[in-house]
């Protein structure tokens, strides 16, 4: 990421108008006019509605799409990695190594704890939210807003198959209510071997050329236990994309920070990102050491290592962007320009002139709390058993409160996902749990200090390893009773969840006791941050959004919020150090790149199928679509709304995309639809899937009446 200069020009994106191809647009504010002006095609409302209904969100942090009328869903292999590894553990297999294909629907395997959401309705609730908090004191802002959002979400629906979320857009300039259909019976249908899904491993991650078949197919099942019968789904493209072709990506980008102030950018650069990188580097090293114990330990922890390495590279890329002097100077110039425009208008100056200084003060206060907050509220998440125990303790405490007073994650609209997460029948590995909890407790002691009252009270005379071993080996949270359909029907977790606070308080389970010992202090620092920092900051960001609207208008896109967005772009390579990077790779290139050793070792299925594959078939390609983490698994469609590719990554320059879009260098990376079909057919013998995909057509997906050319 040496050449950052082109990114500087892109930094006007959150302040005025966006470049062509830039933006993660909401479906109710998509710039069809701009697309038509640039490319001669106007996505109509029917086209947009169809694509929206065919797009789904994986609640754990990815995107996906419906690709048949029988609930078949396409996403990335790395988005289904947890499902693949959980099923491997439960079935004493290694589907990550060997791949998985269900030859019949009866063989499709339920993914523990997996949830998908389909966006069905968007409603503007800005006035109600802003009116409720208008005269609120800064220290009460968070509580009042939380109660307001909880009430809106509860009114929207609380049934298990409904999920409602109030989404904050433009840092508080707008609030939309998103209503979803919720699906919690998701079954694995197809996944290739990890050696081809993640060919090139961490060295090739966020790079291009790539030769990855990063795909998984799962199926949504209805409440009747049968495959979903869905009216909307995407048809498969029967043509090949060419350089310069128009492309659209529909997905759920996790989050960007393009609308922050300079004080917040500096905090990211100087404290938040370095802190994250240190944590992730240590986690990567610790997991790598664990993997060296043996093949089984490696299998158990592959998902952990993938997440650590991926996140570390993302954080490094973000830090490099903010550490670039010219980039930072342009950020400062942009803020100076907006402040000058505000101060030139007496009315705007009176309303918004103090926002930047107030935010800077809140950033300093946040820094003072950060160490304790990260240690207590975030620091023990690497242990799945501790996470479950804390969830059960908090569930017991929160359910006795009115909906509006609960922690956000325990609001009525979020309870079905919380329950599924806490009760999910996933394999638990004692050795891995002891190792990760030992590391987490060691970090807790180091971060707070050995003489900290919390450390003295919780640790006593015991070491982190002793606490972890006792809690993991003697907890009864591991044992789950499930029925023939994979539903949890018994076990301590269910008993404590159903029994509420009384049952949790009476429990002497060592993992519950550990969570209970830490929770009062964790809650206290969380409440302090939410009351003294988050609430006042939300008020100031809301004012800043109004200032931007007043100066620049509202024709821009909001920062990403892990909600459904649509971006447009074209198939296009880029220039790297004076050399052209072509936009496509082909199947033959994968065999040329293979070395026979990890991470460039092709699976046996590909080696034995080489003569059946066309070496000229497009494999991976890049486009100018504006994406970010969370877009993994997004369908890439052509102007006909047909599947032409599957997003799985961005190039190295896209890592600065949190803070700006660079039209000359930022690229999205996708698997070509052609190789998806060819591999399923000629490598994996998945003819039933190929037939299901190619037979699934709709009149609208053909594009004839969906838009204008």
Give names to the regions the model predicted:
Residues 2-4, 15-709:
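Terminal presequence/propeptide segments associated with secretion/organelle targeting
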Residues 6-11:
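Sec-dependent N-terminal signal peptides
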